[in-house]
Amino acid sequence: GVGSVVAHKCAQASLNGAFGHITLASRTESRCRKIAESIRQRYGVEISTAKVDADNVPELCQLIRTVRPFMVLNIALPYQDLHIMDACLECGVHYLDTANYEPPETAHFEYSWQWAYQDRFREHGLCALLGSGFDPGVTNVFAAWVMKHELDEVHVLDIIDCNAGSNGQAFATNFNPEINIREVSARGRYWERGEWVQTEPLSWSMTYDFPSGIGPKKCYLMYHEELECLALHLRGLKRARFWMTFSDSYLNHLAILKDVGMTRIDPVEYKGQKIVPIQFLASLLPDPASLGPLTRGKTCIGNVMRGVKDGREKTVYIYNVCVHEDCYKEIGSQAISYTTGVPAMIGAMMIMTGKWNKPGVYNI
């Protein structure tokens, strides 16, 4: 998954002196050891591993004080963001993540919980960098670059995320199944003329003709966290939306699972035990980390931005194309994890070199 990509890319960068010692920690240390062995075989770099429960702040603090890192890269679940931020504050280390906080009991995410840490991180002289993945992350950088170099005002922003790859599975997610299904099943939301407008889940769609030989694909309107930040900072913005492609097979399976209650996030009674259906479902689905050798095709993620330059209307499309097979050949991962993990490594490098190291809590 993404954690493996981040560890591999940080190890690669350490060969050039960008990073010192790396410790990879997880609730399941055996997975960390497998990643560490892959890194040793590929690059000759030794990294440490550790077992930690990211929901347990004292346990996190004990590990941080033992390792004494410059910063913590949080590639855990969004539910754990605040616990890890608390531990970083207590131990005096910088923080980075790739996804904003989401409470386990509610399928709703927003940055307000993490932005509330602004004063505490600033007072401690620590930097917390939020959303250092691809979307959010690189899509924010794309927007800032276009605003700086291509447009005087941005009137319309459409972020479009296409996975044109195939893994041959009837139903599988390319990152944590529980998080993926919660996100896709939620109501859509977009920003227009200063207000948030809600839509029913996956009720709006459009067809977009993607570059690099991908061609036309159906895209569905969703809510994605970078919209919350970009709506505040893009000069002249009138509308901002996020779109993602899904196969018919994925959507059909998802609809059936929802109809029979398997996407519920509340506990249910089963033979005297409380279980959460979506968590049980996630345990049955393929591990996203296992999909690398099975996945073929390309991803294309980018921003379509329409606005004004020198008084004239102008549209800019800035995007990235990644090939699943190339990612697997390089580090044993599919492109979804790769495109999230590489920006996390770059964000960490920017903090460690001081280029982005400013006390407080910031989005890319």
Regions inferred by a protein language model and the residue ranges of each:
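C-terminal catalytic/substrate-binding lobe primarily of soluble NAD(P)-dependent oxidoreductases
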Residues: K148-I364
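Rossmann-fold cofactor-recognition segment
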Residues: R42-N56
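Hydrophobic/small residue at the entry helix of a nucleotide-binding pocket
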Residues: V2-G3
